[in-house]
């Protein structure tokens, strides 16, 4: 819910709110609201997370993209995620199929 509430906020590289986000800053702060500490790096979030198969994705799981991993979003269900995409765009809901999928973790 926290991440969804940031929809429309601008992307800012290295930012972790409150008015701008990068992808790992958004996931880091969203999960901190649930008492989970994550590093501010998509690659490190993947490296330290509990890996799960794509077939077992549940809302709230973190989904990762590219090789090497350079993007992360929060899975919403129905093949969609909320994420901070890149400069010039804003936090948005997108299909996870729009980028090369690399894996998932459950914090």
Task: Locate the predicted segments by residue.
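Hydrophobic beta-strand signal
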Residues: 62-64
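Catalytic cysteine-centered active-site loop
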Residues: 6-59
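Aromatic- and glycine-rich peptidoglycan recognition patches
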Residues: 52-55, 76-107
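Intrinsically disordered, low-complexity
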Residues: 1-10, 99-107
């Amino acid at each position: 819910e926290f991440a969804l509430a940031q929809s429309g906020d601008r992307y800012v590289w290295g930012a972790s709110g409150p008015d701008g986000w990068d992808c790992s800053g958004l996931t880091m702060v969203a999960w901190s609201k649930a008492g989970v500490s994550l590093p501010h790096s998509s690659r490190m979030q993947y490296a330290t997370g509990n890996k799960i198969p794509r077939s077992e994705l549940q809302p709230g799981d973190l989904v990762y993209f590219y090789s090497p991993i350079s993007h992360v979003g929060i899975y919403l269900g129905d093949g969609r995620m909320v994420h901070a995409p890149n400069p010039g765009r804003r936090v948005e809901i997108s299909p996870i199929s729009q980028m090369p999928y690399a894996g998932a973790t459950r914090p």
